[in-house]
Design a protein with these regions (language model features):
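Bacterial N-terminal signal peptides
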Residues: 8-18
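Long, low-hydrophobicity ectodomains and other hydrophilic envelope-associated domains
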Residues: 34-207
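Positively charged n-region of N-terminal signal peptides that target proteins for export
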Residues: 1-6
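Ubiquitous "structural anchor" signal
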Residues: 17-20, 97
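Boundary at the C-terminal end of the N-terminal hydrophobic targeting segment
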Residues: 20-29
Length: 207
């Protein structure tokens, strides 16, 4: 049975990092889910690359994941996508993402990489966060997207929380539906029963 689950943590990530422009006009997130941010700083030079071990919470072993960025999306670019979603719906956003240039990719094991048109770099109090939005679902062996209808859950998301000290981690959300609540709050719905955990996250030399 297919199940749609809402994750509060995912909602916080997407509102704060993926689909909210920095600045005014955004409702403040609840204290329990807000990630403290560091003062604004210059976006680092690209290319950048990270590697992580992906653990399937439902079993299925470990896969090494590589995320590569040749550029980062600006708050204005992300706000434009948010406005498009609110005004014209998910299909319009998907069409826009498919027409945008690729600024990165994510690869699972030795499989062909998934192109990424949107990557956000957000400084935090403990390091920085990366939110990468794919133009299509992430369907790899063992993922929860098997048999999914791409028109309903058309985007995949990869997040990394990279810390200057301590362990860094992240998540893979193989398939996400883009929606707003009645109050205008962005409310993504995740297909499947659980996200896929990323552990042992570290930067590596970009090739």
């Amino acid at each position: 049975m297919r199940t749609t689950i809402r994750y509060a943590a995912v909602l916080s990530i997407m509102i704060l990092a993926g689909f909210a422009a920095s600045g005014a006009a955004q409702a403040p997130a609840a204290p329990a889910t807000t990630t403290p941010t560091a003062p604004a700083s210059t976006v680092p030079a690209v290319p950048m690359q990270w590697v992580a071990a992906m653990y399937n919470m439902q079993g299925g072993g470990t896969t090494w994941v590589t995320l590569h960025a040749d550029g980062f999306s600006s708050p204005a670019q992300v706000q434009a996508l948010k406005d498009l979603l609110k005004d014209q719906g998910q299909t319009a956003v998907v069409n826009q993402l498919n027409g945008m240039p690729q600024i990165g990719w994510v690869r699972f094991g030795k499989q062909t990489g998934y192109p990424i048109p949107v990557i956000r770099y957000i400084p935090t109090a403990t390091g920085y966060r990366i939110v990468a939005v794919c133009a299509r679902p992430i369907g790899f062996v063992g993922a929860v997207t098997q048999g999914i209808i791409e028109t309903d859950y058309p985007n995949g998301v990869v997040t990394l929380d990279v810390k200057t000290k301590g362990n860094s981690a992240g998540q893979v959300l193989p398939a996400v539906k883009l929606e707003f609540n009645e109050d205008g709050t962005f409310d993504p719905k995740v297909y499947g029963t659980a996200p896929l955990r990323l552990m042992q996250v570290r930067e590596e030399s970009a090739k």
